Amino acid sequence: MQRVLEEIAQERARQEHLLSIGKFTHTCASIDGMSEHARMTVLTEEYLEADELARAMLRLARGVNDRDELTELRKELVQIAAVAAAWVESIDTRIELSEG
């Protein structure tokens, strides 16, 4: 479990790095400039990429674990978790700011 959480943290750091070099204008952790709808769009996009991979794996061979496909699916799931974590960060920051 710890390894997975570390990978999610690394993905969050990667997202923030991409923001810092101008690839993104915001991340889901941004407290302004990004609506809840936009955050949901980002999360949904990541989910759909993972869903597409999972469905492709099922079509190719039910019950057969293709290592490359599983590795790619795992990568997408870590990205989903990181986007969700970023959104939680934004919510926490906004709650803290409203308290004080």
What is each of the regions a protein language model found here?
Residues 1-100:
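Flexible "arm" and connector segments at domain edges
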